[in-house]
Amino acid sequence: MSKLNHIRNFSIIAHIDHGKSTLADRFIQYCGGLSDREMSEQVLDSMDIERERGITIKAQSVTLYYDAKDGSRYQLNFIDTPGHVDFSYEVSRSLAACEGALLVVDAAQGVEAQSVANCYTAIEMGLEVIPILNKMDLPQAEPARVRHEIEEIIGIDAAGAVEASAKAGMGIQESLEQIVQLVPPPEGDPDAPLQALIIDSWFDNYLGVVSLVRVKNGTLNKGDKILIKSTKTQELVTSIGVFTPKRTETGCLKAGEVGYVIAGIKDIHGAPVGDTITLAKTPDVASLPGFKRVQPQVYAGVFPVSSDDYEDFRDALDKLTLNDASLFFEPETSDALGFGFRCGFLGMLHMEIIQERLEREYDLDLITTAPTVVYEVLTKKNEVIKVDNPSRLPDPGFIEEMREPIVEANILVPQAYLGNVISLCVEKRGVQKNMQFLGNQVALSYELPMGEVVLDFFDRLKSVSRGYASLDYHFVRFQAANLVRLDILINGDKVDALALIVHRDNAASRGRLLTEKMKELIPRQMFDVAIQAAIGGQIVSRTTVKALRKNVLAKCYGGDVSRKKKLLQKQKEGKKRMKQVGSVEIPQDAFLAVLKVDK
């Protein structure tokens, strides 16, 4: 009986809050991975941010040993996956290392769009998908309806789905039995030349780069010289083992296993995710198919508050990119904010989390400008250029047409909220493509401009549907649109960090809202501050922050009116002079106001 038959690699697919991390905790407890004393809630969510927000961001892995009912001992390698739409690339990375996936569905809420998308990814990759109904301890659980939904919406047989409750600890053994029986064992040859796929890497201050790998063929031992295919560098393996969630050294990893490798790599880019590791003596081994590089969808300028932090900021970004392959950055300068970086993110949540991680883990103070998506511009010379920063948009005279990215959004919503969701999509300039009634739910398919989706669509969708609607979207194409750049001028000077690209129909109303909002946020000065929104040379709205002024008439009791006029005139001239030389400090909140302008 070969060792491979007793290995099962699986991951869990679930929507946010359907109980994925809690189920993982129960598996670890059942298999004795941690003693009760070390057990904490959501053991695998190791980042503080993950625990606070109750979401999983990074893929983690755990190796458990399970004594099955058939008397054999199985090695279960479980790779955790995130559930939020912004992190779907993490999911595809985790799935590439598995042969099976558990689809965890909340028995009260039913199937959500996110799980559907990830489930299709798993089925396309040829994984065995096992449905599990979680939260069966809730009084409002409806297993029959949810089973029907899984069959209707996803199309996999759910008759034998395990009924479990991770919180109450029921159905855990049944789930583990299903994994052993239904998930196929990995294929591979422990004696062939080594081929291992890097699923994830992160930087440890003491150990250098730690990589999570899945060995496809061959065996990797401590003390081996390895070759990293894309960088062609050779390294010596100093430590090798598995996570039981604690790091446990085993000295070797064989075909089919998942574990970590430390090879004293100090260069942050030494072990790129999706790369292949092989032994230095067999450099000709074919590279394994990696992952598709994810394209950032949202760009924003990120600047350190004090320019002394610029170098630390760059190092911090370097370390984060190692651990988060989808983060993209390049240096940028702004007149208003000095030196910083233009960063690309997968979505607004990703952007918030990166900013929070930078501020927490690296102790930086940052200012973020309004996020924009990438636009395509066709110039009069017939060149196509991509613009991810409104201040780099060419002069309108050179532009033949502008194209905005369009996404196809799939929305699942209960029938009661259908009207609200449709009117939200129409407000966001959406075009309905399809609509299907599935039991109590409705599946809507819309084409929407990405610029409208990434900003606040997700939050608005949740609020108009009381949290029941779920969303999944992917980029389809660029489409010509009537877009303009909206500039914000303060005392006649353009502030590059506040520029936006908007649709011409919304430009005037957006400009008005913005200037009103800025008026509240810019503190009063000793002179009037004019805040204007302009499209090209045309001013579409204006507000004024009134000057603070001393009461110069206080000393005139009674007295002649001409005396009062003279004093007021003198004050006016003083203010006028001051305005020519004065500069206005723009507070951090003002840059964020651009994001939070409600329609």
From Swiss-Prot:
Reactions catalysed, as given in the entry: GTP + H2O = GDP + phosphate + H(+)
Residues in tr-type G domain copies: 5-187
EC number: 3.6.5.n1
GO cellular component terms, semicolon-separated: plasma membrane
Cross-referenced Pfam families: EFG_C, GTP_EFTU, GTP_EFTU_D2, LepA_C
Protein keywords: Cell inner membrane, Cell membrane, GTP-binding, Hydrolase, Membrane, Nucleotide-binding, Protein biosynthesis
Membrane topology: Peripheral membrane protein
Residues that hold GTP according to the record: 17-22, 134-137
UniProt keyword Membrane present: yes
Family: Belongs to the TRAFAC class translation factor GTPase superfamily. Classic translation factor GTPase family. LepA subfamily.
PANTHER family in the cross-refs: TRANSLATION FACTOR GUF1 HOMOLOG, CHLOROPLASTIC (PTHR43512:SF4), TRANSLATION FACTOR GUF1-RELATED (PTHR43512)
Reported function: Required for accurate and efficient protein synthesis under certain stress conditions. May act as a fidelity factor of the translation reaction, by catalyzing a one-codon backward translocation of tRNAs on improperly translocated ribosomes. Back-translocation proceeds from a post-translocation (POST) complex to a pre-translocation (PRE) complex, thus giving elongation factor G a second chance to translocate the tRNAs correctly. Binds to ribosomes in a GTP-dependent manner.
Name of this protein: Elongation factor 4
Gene: lepA
